[in-house]
UniProtKB/Swiss-Prot annotation:
The gene is Insig1. A motif (KxHxx) lies at residues 253-259. There is a cross-link at K138, K140 (Glycyl lysine isopeptide (Lys-Gly) (interchain with G-Cter in ubiquitin)). This is Insulin-induced gene 1 protein. It comes from the Eukaryota. Pfam families: INSIG.
Length: 259
């Protein structure tokens, strides 16, 4: 026959104290590696609760990070435009006066700022598309890989002006293979491929519009030669800037884990 004290221990009374549990916001603050945060309310939307939006302690930190990344990408675009412009001037591809330094700051002064703005837009667009598609890019997420990607892109641009090919088809196929090789080596994402093709198409159309209206000129009388390598340069440039934008969006680089 069961005893009375067995029932008392097996079935707790209604007045028994429940085990104490920490609020959900305090648990997220304790797990956040960037420091303690503010406990979040229970009625917050699902996308804003702990574990879904990272460890941002201040509401304005996201905007501050966005401005910083935009400035870095804009500066990179301006510097890269100046460097590539110097390479093309040395190969007599673009039509400029003999004074190279004066050319950079007088003729076509709007080109570097436009390239910087385009770099900022593209660099911010890549991680946004990755987040929207739910496919975070994790292939070669390190600054050393980004630096190698920049070097390969500059090499492709230099080869497009330096190497001599028998016809435009051979030039286009060679540069297309190099550009796809750059994407396969440093990106390998569907979003990166799609954005690169879109950027190449739109940028080539804008360049043709500027040339046909006399805003921008090339030394080569055959513009078909220029159009044969422009899409490849824009494609590889979009992939390169996208890798920089993704790396900047990471914040603190993650250490590789071996499972």
């Amino acid at each position: 026959m069961p005893r009375l004290h067995d029932h008392v221990w097996n079935y707790p009374s209604a007045g028994a104290a429940r085990p104490y549990s920490l609020p959900r916001g305090m648990i997220a603050a304790a797990a956040c590696p960037q420091g303690p945060g503010v406990p979040e309310p229970e009625h917050a939307p699902r996308g804003q609760r702990a574990g879904t939006t990272g460890c941002s302690a201040r509401p304005g930190s996201w905007h501050h990070d966005l401005v910083q990344r935009s400035l870095v990408l804009f500066s990179f675009g301006v510097v890269l435009a100046l460097v590539l412009n110097l390479l093309q001037i040395q190969r007599n591809v673009t039509l400029f006066p003999d004074e190279v330094i004066a050319t950079i700051f007088s003729s076509a002064w709007w080109v570097p700022p436009c390239c910087g703005t385009a770099a900022a837009v593209v660099g911010l667009l890549y991680p946004c598309i990755d987040s929207h598609l739910g496919e975070p890019h994790k292939f070669k997420r390190e600054w050393a890989s980004v630096m190698r990607c920049i070097a390969v892109f500059v090499g492709i641009n230099h080869a497009s002006a330096k190497l001599d090919f028998a016809n435009n088809v051979q030039l286009s196929l060679t540069l297309a293979a190099l550009s796809l090789g750059l994407w396969w080596t440093f990106d390998r994402s569907r979003s990166g491929l799609g954005l690169g093709i879109t950027i190449a198409f739109l940028a080539t159309l804008i360049t043709q519009f500027l040339v046909y209206n006399g805003v921008y000129q090339y030394t080569s009388p055959d513009f078909l030669y220029i159009r044969s390598w422009l899409p490849c340069i824009f494609f590889s440039g979009g992939v390169t800037v996208g890798n920089i934008g993704r790396q900047l969006a990471m914040g603190v680089p993650e250490k590789p884990h071996s499972d």
